[in-house]
UniProtKB/Swiss-Prot annotation:
PANTHER family documented for this protein: PHOSPHORIBOSYLFORMYLGLYCINAMIDINE SYNTHASE SUBUNIT PURQ
GN (gene name): purQ
SUPFAM superfamilies: Class I glutamine amidotransferase-like
Documented EC number(s): 6.3.5.3, 3.5.1.2
GO molecular function: ATP binding; glutaminase activity; phosphoribosylformylglycinamidine synthase activity
Protein name: Phosphoribosylformylglycinamidine synthase subunit PurQ
Active site residues of this protein: C86, H195, E197
Function description: Part of the phosphoribosylformylglycinamidine synthase complex involved in the purines biosynthetic pathway. Catalyzes the ATP-dependent conversion of formylglycinamide ribonucleotide (FGAR) and glutamine to yield formylglycinamidine ribonucleotide (FGAM) and glutamate. The FGAM synthase complex is composed of three subunits. PurQ produces an ammonia molecule by converting glutamine to glutamate. PurL transfers the ammonia molecule to FGAR to form FGAM in an ATP-dependent manner.
Keywords assigned: ATP-binding, Cytoplasm, Glutamine amidotransferase, Hydrolase, Ligase, Nucleotide-binding, Purine biosynthesis
Species this protein is from: Listeria welshimeri serovar 6b (strain ATCC 35897 / DSM 20650 / CCUG 15529 / CIP 8149 / NCTC 11857 / SLCC 5334 / V8)
CDD domains in the record: GATase1_FGAR_AT
Amino acid sequence: MKFAVIQFPGSNCDLDMLHAIRDSLGEEAEYVWHAETSLEGFDAVLLPGGFSYGDYLRTGAIAKFSSIMPEVLRFAETGKPVLGVCNGFQILTEIGLLPGALIRNNNLHFICKTVPLRVVNGNTIFTGLYEDNEVIHVPVAHGEGNYYCDDETLLKLKENNQIVFTYDSVNPNGSRADIAGIVNERGNVLGMMPHPERAVEDIIGGTDGLRLFQSIVQAWKEEQVNA
């Protein structure tokens, strides 16, 4: 399986993502610069964390207009996996692949720590190797990770089982309904604020994030068998 790691000016978690895929997962991964216009040959797209374009205007607002983004939209429309982490999640909301928005943390401070997450939906291509309601531990590092949406959108997310991860015990940023990660209605686009790529080795604190990437590979292999 081959992963594309999209690089924007200001990305700083792209190396972590590449390492997670190549070294911990044992799959192929390549950087794709934001000015490129093709994702041909890739099976999954990863939008990493960081501060794309310096977070000017607002997080993800300028990345929305990068040359690669129309291709990311087309890629998602084919049903292939798209994962946006932290700034990547913010970008996914900006381009309309996911509903809602990410705003300033309610304490107005940058947060960097490992937090407990509850797997609300274990029946997605991203969570197939987790149990429903399992509590895992994954790092967060953000200043604008407070997920917001209106009441109608929140109701729709709940009805469609689109909420995949919630913060457990303590909500670190004020997100509505403790939301940490959501998928689109089709289930092939996941945005999450916590960093699974930083939880892939015991030596750096745990491997709870590795199963997310393993789940993607498992779903892809099953699709190849059934094709």
